[in-house]
Amino acid sequence: MHVVILGSAAGGGVPQWNCRCSICSLAWAGDPRVKARTQSSIAVSPDGERWLLLNASPDIRQQIQANPQMHPREGLRHSPIHAVLLTNGDVDHVAGLLTLREGQPFTLYATPGILASVSDNRVFDVMAADVVKRQTIALDETFEPVPGLSVTLFSVPGKVPLWLEDASMEIGAETETTVGTMIEAGGKRLAYIPGCARVTEDLKARVAGVDALLFDGTVLEDDDMIRAGVGTKTGWRMGHIQINGETGSIASFADVALGRRVLIHINNTNPILIEDSPERAGVEARGWTVAHDGLTLDL
């Protein structure tokens, strides 16, 4: 199984377009310790030829250009991307669908709830129904979006997208609006979970023994954005678990047998983005890799 992390940042990327927090300021200045990162997306293939895109980042055209595996290869129009799968309806995961409208056939997969959030917004009708097939997938149903690639969706604690929030919103609920993905090919297993509000015992049992876990690394501490002075929301309020602490992701998975442990969907205020920082050293010392754009895994 071949995995390419196309975009390793959370919504807005690094640096964010209007941000001068300490981390974005380093990126704007060209400091090599802070790599520029695009918004959350990965691609997975069983053979290096046919690819499944997981989440369609607003930066998808840039990501395709930066990764030769994603380039058109034959004829006047072609794409190695045969299918797209959404893990939630967040803007940084669906806006890129608007770029994928140029008459290229593929199938769009998501749970009924996630797909409804797309279908209810007429702007996505630019993906012509006779070109882009939309396929609903039930939780815990195994399907094959690309030949040789088996995928199963499962609920994880999360919340509805910001643009769908209302008075009834519940943070940490396990519904079909935020899902994790188990991907299998050639006897290897990859768990992809870019958004998760907390780690449950059921989640730990589900991912135990995977060859690689790509997991929500949005915030190091729950109050990252508040500390940086750029916002008032905690990680929890945004539906994202913190990395550090007794209930954080690293501690929660410490007793779980895993292969590669990779942090993805990293917010611009997260100090692990600074390569020589004590925060980066701390997560690496505990066995985790901080993802960057273009990182590849061959499982």
Swiss-Prot record:
Species this chain originates from: Methylorubrum populi (strain ATCC BAA-705 / NCIMB 13946 / BJ001) (Methylobacterium populi)
Superkingdom per UniProt: Bacteria
Involved pathway(s): Cofactor biosynthesis; pyrroloquinoline quinone biosynthesis
CDD domains, per the entry: PQQB-like_MBL-fold
InterPro entries: Metallo-B-lactamas (IPR001279), PQQ_synth_PqqB (IPR011842), RibonucZ/Hydroxyglut_hydro (IPR036866)
Annotated function: May be involved in the transport of PQQ or its precursor to the periplasm.
Family, per entry: Belongs to the PqqB family.
Example of a GO biological process term: pyrroloquinoline quinone biosynthetic process
This protein's encoding gene: pqqB
Coiled-coil annotated spans: none
Entry keyword set: PQQ biosynthesis, Transport
Residues annotated as signal peptide: none
The protein's name in its UniProt record: Coenzyme PQQ synthesis protein B
